[in-house]
Amino acid sequence: MANGNASSDGPGNPLAAVVSTTGGVMGGAPSSAVSTYVKLVLLGLIICISLVGNLVVSLLVLRDRALHKAPYYFLLDLCLADTIRSAVCFPFVLVSIKNGSAWTYSVLSCKVVAFMAVLFCFHAAFMLFCISVTRYMAIAHHRFYSKRMTFWTCVAVVCMVWTLSVAMAFPPVFDVGTYKFIREEDQCIFEHRYFKANDTLGFMLMLAVLILATHVVYMKLLLFEYKHRKMKPVQMVPAISQNWTFHGPGATGQAAANWIAGFGRGPMPPTLLGIRQNLHNQNRRLLGMEEFKAEKQLGRMFYVITLFFLVLWSPYIVACYWRVFVKACTIPHRYLSTTVWMSFAQAGVNPIICFFLNKDLKKGLLAHLPPCCRTPPQLPREPYCVM
């Protein structure tokens, strides 16, 4: 009897296995429900922030004539792309999470959603690279930039960026099994496999080269600003004088005073020649101090946007390279979920950065707020005396 009881309660008993399995499922079900709830809340928050923030920035740029400039046109394009991504791609992710990480639509719709997700990723990379080039031209070659960077030039740049993005995202549509639903990521996206299985390595290299080239341009701009951080010293040109009548590039009003006082003979000296020369040198400057500060502020804002794009996308890019170079690899589910949600958060970060680092957008936002939400202006304090 003892042996019978021991054998019936041993680890090989099927009833014990069923009980242990049921206990494991019951223990894992609450954690899975909590994970699903957290994902839904986070993605819903990302969608709301992205839609509201990007639409507000877009409306401010469209309504304010002072913002009708090349950098704000590019910012408008970025905001509209993030708005479409949040409104079209993210709701399908919400539905797939709600259905237990399953795609309930057709295969064609999955390909369309995956195509749009890859399209917006490459669009942001190409646009940030073009913005970095224009920021460098605005400071290093301001005269050429002010003449050539017109509205139609901006339209041409935007069209070129969208064309290149479509060229990068469209070919996988015809490849069998390239765009598919990835259960671990809860989304339809490019299936990153071993580099000998498909062309995923070429796409990842193109994205990495774009991000690297963008930061190289900003580093070059930083070096240019560092070299030109100090003003050149004024070189004083001495005036010419034979009989106390100073003339030449360095002549000042003292020559006229000497002539009136009786020093020297002859006609009135050209006293303002040196001043005219200085004004001529000032007109030759390519970029004034106020313009330089404005361009530098815009460059700082766009670089922070680029930096956040790198920070939020780099973990997912690392996971993609992991799949490409390691055959039959297993990425930890928690790490992969975190990287995917970081890439989703990138769609709502740009408006926050713009309102924090751009004074013009901040003023435009405060001007359109109701009076109850505005902060009262601080009045200047006048000195007073206590008797």
UniProtKB/Swiss-Prot annotation:
Record organism: Danio rerio
Function: Is a receptor for the SMIM20 derived peptides Phoenixin-14 and Phoenixin-20. It mediates the Phoenixin-14 and Phoenixin-20 augmentation of gonadotropin-releasing hormone (GNRH) signaling in the hypothalamus and pituitary gland. In the ovary, it mediates the effects of Phoenixin-14 and Phoenixin-20 induced granulosa cell proliferation during follicular growth.
Gene3D superfamilies: Rhodopsin 7-helix transmembrane proteins
Transmembrane region(s): 41-61, 88-108, 112-132, 154-174, 203-223, 302-322, 336-356
Residues glycosylated per entry: N5, N198
Protein name: Probable G-protein coupled receptor 173
Keywords: Cell membrane, Disulfide bond, G-protein coupled receptor, Glycoprotein, Membrane, Receptor, Transducer, Transmembrane, Transmembrane helix
Family: Belongs to the G-protein coupled receptor 1 family.
